[in-house]
Amino acid sequence: MPIIGGAVAGGAIALAIASGGSSSKSVTTTVVRPAQQAALPASFSSGKGLTVNQIYRSASPGVVDIIVTAQSSNPASGFFGGSGTQKTQGEGAGVVYDSRGDILTDEHVVAGATSVKVNFQDGRSYSAKVLGTDPSTDVGVIRVSAPASELHPIAFADSSAAQVGDPVVAIGSPFSLPETTTSGIVSQTGRSITAPNNYTIPNAIQTDAAINPGNSGGPLLDASAHVLGLNDQIETNNSTASGQGSSSGVGFAIPSNTVRRIADSIIGGQTVKHAYVGVLLAGNSAGGAEIASVQVGTPGALAGLQANDLITAIDGRAITSTDQFIADIDNYTPGQTVTMTVSRAGQTQNIKVKLGTRPASTPSGG
């Protein structure tokens, strides 16, 4: 369940991580299921003179296919002896970020990798290493040793400017079919999805462009062929035994502003840290973010936050929902102090909270 220093309770639907291979990961989120939008025809124009084909031709040289080999536990070893691990392969996509060979993808694509191979559009392949990952945002960075002629960085868009109805194009490797291109629209913005470590990724972009296993880490492109986000998850009610599902017209991308912020920290050799309050949040409540419980010893507990408190503002900015609270806290860094306006038993009070550093995974018991 989505968590910001805790978790959001109730009302979850299944999401499948959209990477290929034998992964059995699945996550949940509290997004409301909207009516599916019909995908735009391949001849649509963005209004800026770019068709799907033009977007593809502009961006595809900077999209790569990623093949990952990892070690996983071998359930048969206990019965038949031998090694307790086995090699597994997974597949995803990535975006060339700079001329140094840095490629951005999803953390879950490269998690646990023992080897990484990158396939470029011209068919050439090169080995890569994992430079760093952030499970809290599902962002990963790999670096490939390839000649400059292979590296075609794609410009990034400002994801905060995305609007419902904007045309988008997804490129990736669904079902081991590299350079597959699909089109659609931005179905909604500001969604919350669940990261590999069970925290919440705020401001995700929802799209009806077809996203399937193998699309993870590939770009969601705007009408200017700029990266609006990295394709990450799909809603599915028909997951296979491996935990994978197919497109249902409801997909989610990590917003480009989040991707760039995390990637720049990783490439710069910094440790990625996230602000932490330590509260379990109820589902979206009218007029604010309601606290279901407070983790003992956390910044929220030390500041005096209590269960049933309704947070209505942070530093004077109105908070109208749980999702907005999560997104707002994500803009801060550990060590900063914020003033939370809280409604408690009919009384309004301001409580100062010194934000901590988010633990590696959500506390046990939520």
Show the residue positions of the predicted features:
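Serine-dependent protease modules
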Residues: 2-287, 296, 303, 317, ...
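Edge beta-strands of extracellular beta-sandwich domains
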Residues: 351-354
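Conserved catalytic motifs of ABC-family nucleotide-binding domains
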Residues: 308
